[in-house]
Structure formats: C-alpha cells, structure tokens
C-alpha cells in the first residue's frame, strides 16, 4: 500500500477531451494505454501495488460537449523514473470513444515544497513566539529578588498581619493598607512597614503604635480615608503621608514613596479638626525645590501696593511642613505649583483678589487665616488640589476635588 509519507514528487497533467466522459473513463484509459509501455519494472499497476505510486486523482469538468481537467499522480520513484512515467502518460490519445490530449504541466518536488513551508513557519515562530519568550537577565533578577522579598515577609500577632522584617526592632513603623504595599516598600529597601488589611484595625498594630513612632502611608482614595479615620480613633498615629492622587501605594515608585514620607504631616492637625467638619480631607504632600515667581500685577494690597518680597534666611521652603511653618502667625498666603514652587505670595486677607490674577496650574494654597464656605467655593473653581489653613469654619459642602489640612 502506498504511504503519503514517502511521496517525493507530484505529477501534474492537463487533460482535454473532445466529448463528455466520467472519471472512471479517464482512469481506465490511463491504465489501459500505458500497460506494458515501459516494461514490467515501470508498469503502473505494479507500481501502485508495491506502493511506489499513489492513487490517480482525476479532477474534470464538462462544458459545451468538452471535458477539461487535471490529473495528479504522486510518486516515490527517483527523478528519472518519475520523469519517464510522466512522459508516458502524454501518449494517451483517447478516453472512451473521444479524442484526448494529455500534457505534463509540471513535476513538483514535494520535499522542496515542504522545506519552503518549514522555512516560512520558522520565520513566523521566530518573530512571534520567541519575541515574548526572549531571555532578559534583568527580568530574571527581578523575579529572584521578588521571591526573596516575599520570603522576608513576617506575620505578626494573632491576626497574622503582613509586615517587614524590621517592624519589631525599629523605633518607627509605616502603616500601609495591604500585603502588596508591604512588598512594594520592601522592593525599595523599606523594611519597617506593616499592613492594617482593612478598617478593623488589628490589636498588634494598636500596640505597636503605642510603642513606636507611627506613620500612615495609605492610598489617596475613599478606602484610604476610611482606614485613616479608623486608625486615628483607635491608635496613636504620629504622622500621615499620602500616595499621589489616583495611585495606590503598591504602584508607587521609589521617588514617590520617599517624597511622600519626607512630606508627612503631623497627625495632630487632623485629629484636632472640629467634629462638624470630619469630612475635611488631608493634603497628599509632594516636594521639590522652591522658586518665587508671580504674575505681573498679582498679589497687591487693597491700597495697590505689592507686599514686600520675602527673603529666606537659608534655602526656600520645599515641603508642605516648611511652608506651613513659614506662614504660621504671619498673616500671609502662598499659592504653590505642583512641585511646591511658590507661584504667588500675598496678604492672607487678599486671597480672593490674588486668585483672580493667577495663571497656570495651581496645586495648592497655604494661608494663615480661617477659610469659610464662600472662599472654598472660589478655590474649588480653580481645580486646586489642597488647602492648608489656620482653621475651617462653616464648611457645609466641600468640593470633592479639594483636600483640606489644618495648620497646627
């Protein structure tokens, strides 16, 4: 029996018949008119019987009294024998009662076709599959380091909260929301983080806060706000830090984490807020070198004179805490850019007028005065991210986009 796996060549023949015939007529003519033509060794019936020639595939169509089509014959003979067999088929001149013309179109080398397909497929595999699976030494190192960091995780208390390896021995701890936050801090060498893992604060965290300096680093979303509110009620929190708006702690880069921790604010400024204003949010701090610049005509007093330009004793304030300390009890206001540069400094009583003269992005306001609902509404119209003020009175409706912090 012939096996397709042994095929070397495929003979393509073109057939034209002057009349109407069927496939069996064509097959019969092939066997009948080639019998004994090439001797016993190349007899078509014997070649099929021994599996050296495959089945004869006839494909014909009849139209207007004529029959046309192709004949395909697979062969495992060598090149010379296959060529001889193909040429013998061109001697067929009749099919049934009809005149026929048979011509060899081509002899296809199956192995060449297979090799071509193999090469094309190899190109596809090289471009597609190997692209994603390429070996990157940095990725391998990161994967190993990640596994080591996870191994360093500890479980504290009866609640088995996730914590870094230095939480017990360190004088200060950083309270985050979940396990992924602890791992991210470990990634950057911060080993004293502990996860609160929900609004139900574990007993071990309450105990740690009473013994150590506690700083919260929570997501700047509603969930982080609720967790902070719970922590402030049940634990002794010393400082509060926030992730950038719209970003969770587990997504923060090293620079963002360091900046947030460096700009932490005392928790007392949050704890002392009046109960009627519990919905006041806190500022998500950031930091950068400060540089004073003001638009022309901005920040003048009611008499039309510009307040004297401040000269700092050393370097300009670059963090929220420094700005808050600098304006405290001085009756001044500062509008800050996203990198905490001073855009404009004015009298605290002239915030409304200065606001009209500001151009560009204003990140926040630090002011030594009481903020009321009317002024807060005006600030909300400027897409200001935060307001730090001496106090907040009569706040009934706070713009959701503004976070408020009280200067202690």
Curated annotation (Swiss-Prot):
Its cofactor is Mg(2+). Keywords: DNA replication, DNA-directed RNA polymerase, Magnesium, Metal-binding, Nucleotidyltransferase, Primosome, Transcription, Transferase. Binds two Mg(2+) per subunit. Its EC number is 2.7.7.101. Residues 284-298 have a biased composition (Low complexity). The keyword ATP-binding does not apply. GO terms for biological process: DNA replication, synthesis of primer. GO terms for molecular function: DNA-directed RNA polymerase activity; metal ion binding; poly(A) binding. It comes from the Archaea. Mg(2+) 1 binds at residues 177, 219. Residues 171-250 form the Toprim domain. Residues 276-323 are annotated as: Disordered. InterPro entries: DnaG_primase, Primase_DnaG_arc, TOPRIM_DnaG/twinkle, TOPRIM_dom. Mg(2+) 2 binds at residues 219, 221. Pfam families: Toprim_4 (PF13662). Belongs to the archaeal DnaG primase family. NCBIfam families: PRK04031.1-1. Forms a ternary complex with MCM helicase and DNA. RNA polymerase that catalyzes the synthesis of short RNA molecules used as primers for DNA polymerase during DNA replication. This is DNA primase DnaG. The gene is dnaG.
């Amino acid at each position: 029996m012939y096996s397709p796996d042994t095929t070397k060549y495929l003979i393509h023949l073109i057939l034209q018949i002057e009349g109407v015939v069927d496939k069996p007529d064509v097959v019969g003519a092939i066997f009948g008119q080639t019998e004994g033509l090439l001797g016993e060794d190349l007899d078509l019936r014997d070649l099929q019987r021994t599996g050296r020639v495959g089945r004869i595939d006839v494909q014909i169509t009849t139209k207007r009294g004529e029959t046309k089509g192709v004949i395909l014959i697979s062969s495992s003979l060598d090149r010379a024998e296959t060529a001889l067999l193909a040429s013998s088929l061109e001697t067929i001149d009749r099919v049934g009662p009809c005149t026929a013309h048979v011509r060899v179109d081509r002899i296809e080398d199956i192995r060449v076709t297979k090799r071509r397909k193999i090469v094309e497929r190899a190109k596809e595999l090289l471009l597609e599959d190997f692209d994603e699976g390429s070996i990157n030494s940095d990725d391998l190192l990161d994967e190993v380091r990640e596994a080591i960091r996870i191994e360093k995780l500890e479980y504290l208390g009866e609640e088995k909260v996730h914590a870094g390896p230095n939480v017990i021995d360190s004088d200060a701890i950083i309270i985050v929301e979940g396990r992924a936050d602890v791992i991210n801090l470990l990634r950057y060498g911060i080993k004293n983080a502990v996860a609160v893992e929900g609004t139900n604060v574990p007993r071990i965290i309450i105990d740690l806060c009473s013994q150590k300096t506690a700083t919260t680093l929570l997501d700047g979303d509603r969930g982080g706000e609720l967790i902070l509110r719970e922590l402030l009620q049940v634990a002794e929190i010393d400082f509060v830090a926030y992730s950038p708006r719209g970003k969770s702690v587990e997504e923060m880069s090293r620079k963002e984490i360091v900046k947030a921790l460096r700009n932490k604010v005392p928790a007392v400024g949050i704890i002392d807020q009046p109960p009627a204003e519990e919905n006041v949010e806190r500022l998500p701090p950031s930091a950068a070198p400060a540089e004073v610049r003001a638009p022309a005509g901005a920040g003048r007093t009611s008499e039309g004179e510009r307040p004297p330009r401040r000269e700092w004793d050393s370097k300009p304030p670059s963090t929220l805490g420094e700005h808050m300390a600098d304006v405290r009890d001085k009756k001044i206001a500062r509008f800050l850019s996203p990198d905490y540069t001073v855009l404009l400094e004015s009298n605290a009583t002239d915030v409304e007028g200065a606001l009209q003269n500001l151009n560009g992005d204003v990140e926040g306001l630090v002011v030594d005065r009481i903020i009321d609902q009317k002024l807060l509404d005006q600030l909300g119209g400027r897409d200001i991210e935060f307001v730090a003020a001496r106090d907040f009175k009569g706040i009934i409706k706070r713009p959701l986009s503004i976070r408020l912090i009280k200067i202690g």
